[in-house]
Design a protein with these regions (language model features):
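Signature of the first transmembrane helix
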Residues: 1-17, 106, 159-188, 313-317, ...
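Interfacial transmembrane-helix starts/ends
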Residues: 2, 28-44, 158, 225-240, ...
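Helix-loop junctions and terminal segments of transmembrane helices
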Residues: 8, 12-30, 200-225, 291-294
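Membrane-interface junctions at transmembrane-helix termini in multi-pass inner-membrane proteins
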Residues: 19-30, 74-97, 219, 277-306
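Membrane-interface "helix-start" segments
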Residues: 34-37, 64-67, 93, 156-163, ...
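Interfacial segments at transmembrane-helix termini and the short loops linking adjacent helices
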Residues: 54-68, 251-283, 326
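Hydrophobic alpha-helical transmembrane segments
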Residues: 69, 95-142, 307-311, 325-349
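Transmembrane helical elements of multi-pass membrane transporters/channels
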Residues: 100-101, 122-141, 150-216, 278, ...
Length: 373
């Protein structure tokens, strides 16, 4: 089951070079027909190319390769449509589609019986139902006007998509490179650190949800200053929610953590404290990075990820060997803070706002919450 899911994720990763989150930005700037056609053709290539790789290197059981290719293609289409809905700020359809897909998958899986073959069938059924609905939801938005801009749209989509995917890969190193350093330096205590990280990273859920809404709004906003002011509102809201979530996490008794994860997982609290600056930095970075995505400055995301990688590359081993798991949390926080700082400076330079306008929220939080509609 895990190999099939991994194979599907590889197909989607290649597809996202053209049909990924860049569609949110481009959906209000390029003809939708051209965007969809380019994304569909690229998703076919992604499924066939990655399917061949999976088969040739035997990364997926041979009798499930065709299923993996098919499901991967369906998930690519599903992802493409969802990115377009975000770009259209059609949150109702976007959220319902994701919910329906999961519900259908679970129901079919339970009805057929819990086997690997039935898991595959459940995935197929869930994506077919969701895709059928998404096609109907999109049909009114499609307008056939003039020639299909295949080549120009492909070039633009690929350049943006490549920058996004490359920054995601570097950011993944920022998130997880410290794991390898801990494993090499300290051995069996990695599990304790991973639990602390999972607890801390769960606090990113609100900021990530807010950032997706922000991305859609900024991509459709014409006035530059309004884009900046929207971002400031989301920054303050993300800061508030993350602060509250951090306080709650700090107050959770250590006994609860031991009861949930086992008595061997002790000493997570100091690590969580060390990660707190990093948690807040990533929460704020979500708003900065989605502003830059909304104005088409994807290259800055890659630079920010590389800036964040510097502390871990140069000081990661020293922090772990000298201060243990707390040191790992500290250097991780420094890494995230470096990225956040860079993104903040870029936002300040592009926004046209004064430092006071960024730091002081003009409207109340109740007014800011209305932006979520």
């Amino acid at each position: 089951m895990g190999l099939i899911v991994l194979g599907i994720s590889f197909i989607v990763m290649i597809s996202n070079l053209v049909g990924g989150s860049a569609l949110v930005y481009l959906s209000s700037r390029k003809p939708l027909v051209s965007l969809l056609l380019v994304s569909y053709v690229w998703s076919v290539f992604s499924a066939l190319f990655m399917g061949f790789v999976l088969w040739y290197f035997q990364l997926v059981p041979a009798h499930f390769v065709a299923w993996t290719i098919g499901i991967g293609f369906l998930e690519c289409l599903f992802s493409i449509h969802n990115q377009v809905f975000i770009g259209q700020e059609n949150w109702k359809i976007h959220n319902l589609l994701k919910l329906v897909q999961k519900i259908v998958q679970l129901v079919v899986f339970l009805l057929l019986g819990i086997t690997l073959h039935h898991f595959v069938l459940a995935l197929v059924a869930s994506y077919l139902v969701s895709l059928l609905w998404s096609f109907f939801a999109l049909k009114d938005s499609i307008r056939f006007e003039g020639n299909i801009q295949f080549v120009s749209v492909f070039k633009t989509s690929f350049v943006y998509g490549f920058q996004i995917q490359l920054s995601n890969i570097v950011q993944l190193l920022n998130y997880r490179l410290i794991y390898f350093i801990i494993e090499k330096s300290m051995g069996g205590v990695l599990g304790i650190y991973i639990v602390a990280v999972q607890l801390a990273e769960s606090l990113w859920i609100p900021s990530k949800a807010l950032a997706i809404i922000q991305y859609g709004k900024i991509s459709n906003e014409i006035e530059s200053r309004k884009k900046s002011e929207l971002t400031v509102s989301f920054i303050h809201l993300s800061f508030l929610l993350t602060t509250l979530a951090l306080i709650v996490l700090w107050m959770i008794p250590n006994e609860w953590v031991l009861g949930l994860f086992g008595k061997d997982i002790s000493g997570t609290k100091p690590i969580i404290y060390a990660l707190s600056l990093g948690v807040m930095s990533v929460a704020l970075s979500q708003s900065f990075s989605h502003y830059l995505s909304g104005v088409g400055r994807y290259k800055q995301l890659l630079i920010a990820a590389l800036v964040g990688l510097i502390p871990i590359l140069f000081f990661g081993k020293y922090a772990v060997t000298t201060y243990g798991l707390v040191g790992a949390g500290m250097i991780t926080s420094v890494s995230y803070a470096f990225s956040c700082g860079y993104l903040g400076v870029v936002f300040y330079r592009l926004s046209g706002l004064s430092l006071k306008e960024i730091l002081v929220l003009k409207t109340g939080f109740l007014e800011t919450f209305k932006l979520l509609k």
